[in-house]
Amino acid sequence: MSLLKNKRRISLRQLKYGNSETRVAVTILFFVICSWNAPAQENIRFRVACWNTENLFDTHHDSLKNDYEFLPNAMRHWNYNRYKKKLSDIARVITAIGEWNAPALIGLCEVENDTVLRDLTHRSPLQELDYRYVMTDSPDLRGIDVALLYQRDLFKLLSSRSISIPMFRQHRPTRDLLHVNGLLLTGDTLDVFVCHLPSRSGGAKESEPYRLHAAQILRTEVDSVLHTRLHPQVIIMGDFNDYPNNKSIRKILEAEAPPIRSDSLDIATHPATSPSSLSPLKLYHLLARKAKTANFGSYKYHGEWGLLDHLIVSGTLLNTSGNFFTHEEKAKVCQLPFLLTDDKKYGGKEPFRTYKGMKYQGGFSDHLPIYTDFELVLP
């Protein structure tokens, strides 16, 4: 019996004072046991999308708006069945973009009024996702506006406002900018700008001053947020009717491709950049680098793909040590097969539009959606 007790004492002594291998094993076991009881961090995917829906009009005339071509008796024969199909199609796309979870935020361009947003969120298949929305009420002559759909469990709305674009050189009135801010689950404030800048009607060069004018107003509003928020988190999205290398984005917003991370997939072809090169007051274009590759874009014009739709973020949102961040590798153009059709004139594929000219196609839009994933880190 004494021999057994002595052996037990030796075993305990070996655990306490034994060799290094024993001590390491005990240490590992201790931390494994502790980790069972320690609360684990929870990471939530927070998907943000943007889409120009191409003329989402109802079938009724809005007073003082030039929406006559989208009435049942007009040349386009825009009737209730076509309108209802368009709503269902948009709901289908938004659901598909979200995959297994609904996108947290969706910026929409070319939506006519509150009626179409209410029908989309409450009278289409999208009603199952319980979206809420805010939108502008612009002086645009055609009556098209921008909107933001949001999931209330991920984004608590604090405020929203329309930012008007004063007339410039007697140009016709254009769409307001939409500024929305809300609280994330982390308690941080997120500022979102949804934009649809003046079109290229009349020529890209001739119409450029109007886009520069709108971009300058956007820049001023964004700068105000960047310099007043203690921890500015800004997302800018929408149809700029300009490409990443145009002046509105390159010179006015000064949005450029993010620095390359040392763990980036592009490290083989791009030099690594120190994370310290990120500036919280600077704007970064999540799709700028990809836009330089062939056949990449959200819009096809005369057989050439290009990026008219943009996702731009402040530097804080690229800091992976934070609790809400993204990276350019997460940003994509949504190329679901049913959104595309054969380009019979130039070859390849093109967006499957609702109308091609005046002919009804029954498709979705002349633009493809874009999106990115943020990581929301909860304690």
Question: Predicted regions span which residues?
Answer:
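Active-site beta-strand/loop signature of hydrolases that rely on acidic residues for catalysis
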Residues: 48-53, 78, 83-86, 90-117, ...
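Metal-dependent phosphoester-hydrolase catalytic domains
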Residues: 224-234, 242-379
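Structured beta-strand-rich core segments of catalytic domains in phosphoester-bond hydrolases
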Residues: 53, 111-198
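Bacterial Sec-dependent N-terminal signal peptides
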Residues: 1-43
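Active-site His/acidic residue clusters
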Residues: 64-67, 193-207
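Extracytoplasmic/secreted cell-surface and envelope-processing proteins
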Residues: 58-59, 115-118, 142-143, 201-204, ...
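N-terminal, active-site-proximal structural segment of metallo-dependent hydrolase catalytic domains
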Residues: 36-130, 134-146, 343-348, 362, ...
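Second-shell loop/turn segments in exported
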Residues: 74-81, 102-108, 135-136, 166-168, ...
